[in-house]
Every structure is written in C-alpha cells, then in structure tokens.
A protein has these predicted regions:
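Positively charged n-region of N-terminal signal peptides that target proteins for export
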Residues: 1-4
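Beta-rich carbohydrate-recognition modules and glycan-binding surfaces
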Residues: 19-211
C-alpha cells in the first residue's frame, strides 16, 4: 500500500501531461466565415467578416466570384461560390498587419462542397510575390464537408496570377512569410452542376509582423 500511495502523485502528473495540448502547434492565425448579408457577385470587402482581413480577387473570371446564399434549405450557409466565373478565377485573403509562417505543423481547416468533377485547391502568395497552387485538392461531396490538412505534406506548382494557370513544380518553397491565402478551381465555373463552394476557412500558423 505505501508503494501505491507514493506512485499515485507520479501517475497523476503523467495523466495531466498526456491530457495537455502540445505546445509546439501553431495558433489560429485567422478564420473567415463571411457576413450574413445579401448574396452578390463579385464579392466585395463588405462581405468579409474578419476586420483584420483584406479580400483579393484574381484572374480573367474574377468578376464571377460570388458570395452566395439561399433561403432553402434553412441551414444553407453564406459561402463563396466560383461556379459563375466565366473564366479561371481565384480568391485570397491577407492579414493587414502580419504575414503568416506556414512551416512546421501549420494547417488549414475548411468547410466545402464541390459538385461534378470539381476540386478546390489552396493558393498562396509568398512574401516575395510568388504565387503557388497546391497539389492537394478537395474533391466533390454530396453534402458540406469539414476537412483539415497539413501544409507540410503539400507539393506546390507556381501559378500565374493573371491567368490562374499552374506552372512548373517549385521544390521546397519558403513558406515562412506567406502574404495571402486563398483557393481556386484552376478552371472556369461550371454553374451549379460543376463548381466549388467554401463556407469558412481557418488558417493555423504563426504571425510574422510586416515590416
């Protein structure tokens, strides 16, 4: 019995350590969930819910980037829809005061719904102005789908921000100062049958002050 009594505090410490979150995971850098105001195309800064973020629209089809919502079903969210882009388009968000370090255990969480054969891909603008597009793609689903993925496992291609077309592979890009984060289909919108929808996005990374 004395041995058990002596061991009890040690076991409690081990249990507490096991329950504590790891201290090396980056914090939530930003979340965007769009204001619940009337749908519009193209989406404007007025529809951005996070006051720290600035909106950017890109590509020859950028005027078709729509903030959408329907009265039915009743749980239909306010979301970004690329289905009305007449040509390739992309959307991105940037923090007014900070870059974000997406190295290490940085990750993205988002709630999306794609139809047809469409997939939505992550886009990044680096501190030096380079644009990248991910090999990771969130594909179609029958309903809204929440997913999470690590940045470290992604391969990247350069992206032409004027045309929203992928270029050559970029080996080991420096993701320690990312300026803008967004997404694209790398294709014109296909209307309701073939398009992407993003309800909200969360970026987990460490802030880096803008000089």
């Amino acid at each position: 019995m004395p041995r058990l009594l002596l061991a009890a505090p040690f076991l409690l410490v081990l249990h507490a350590a096991a329950q504590a979150p790891e201290d090396n995971r980056p914090p939530l850098f930003f979340r965007e969930d769009w204001k619940e105001i009337a749908a519009v195309a193209p989406v404007t800064q007025e529809h951005v819910g996070n006051p720290a973020l600035l909106l950017g629209l890109y590509g020859p089809g950028k005027d078709g980037v729509r903030k959408s919502h329907h009265d039915t079903p009743k749980d239909d969210p306010y979301y970004i829809w690329l289905g009305s882009c007449p040509a390739n388009c992309a959307i991105a968000l940037r923090d007014k005061d900070a870059f974000v370090d997406l190295t290490g255990l940085a990750k993205i969480r988002w709630r999306t719904k794609q139809t047809g054969f469409r997939s939505v891909r992550l886009t990044l603008k680096l501190g030096d102005g380079t644009w990248l597009v991910s090999d990771y793609a969130e594909g179609p689903s029958v309903d809204w789908h929440e997913s999470e993925f690590s940045i470290a496992g992604i391969r990247w291609r350069r992206m032409d921000i004027k045309t929203i077309v992928e270029g050559p592979w970029v080996a080991s890009p420096d993701l320690s100062q990312v300026d803008e984060i967004g997404w694209t289909e790398l294709a014109p919108g296909g209307g309701t049958p073939a398009s992407s929808r993003v309800d909200w996005i969360e970026v987990y990374g460490r802030p880096v002050a803008r000089r």
